Amino acid sequence: FSCNNMKVALYCISNPGYHTRGEIKERIREAKVGSLNLHVWQKHEIDNYAINVDAILKYSTQHKRKGKISLPILTKKIEEVVNTLEGDVLENISRELIANSANVNAIHNMALSNEEIDHRLNNPHDAISGKKFFELLSNWTQENYEIPISALHVIPYFERHEVPNEVASLISKIMSGENL
């Protein structure tokens, strides 16, 4: 990307995957050297930004074909799905650390793993696979309310004030041509 002779702002938006914070910082540093505006989501993937109980409830209430859905029922189900997926986060972070630290001793690797896991699970809604979350939630909504659900279904039901700051800020910067 350093061959950008046209002086056109180049933007790349990426999921963090299960990369460590150190790896992500290094990628951002490399991107700046190459004149690439790189933004790595703070959440696991873009779908995680659509995990909003109010927007999910609005969509579900409007489109359900059977049953009665309420905020307490939906909130409980969302927490169940998140809890189900937390184990995947632990496994995938550990796998990534092992793959990238073959020469690091086991004690250091375990400490790094625990630090990354604590950081990610500070808010499990952010760390889980958003795609898998909506897949599991959709299985439940189809069975109980005869409606599929996905991030794309939910996003139009966000109120302006519900749009996550990170998303709104990034869109604003790109639209105005600012560097990230």
Language model features: what each stretch is:
Residues 1-180:
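Acidic, divalent-metal-binding catalytic cores of TOPRIM
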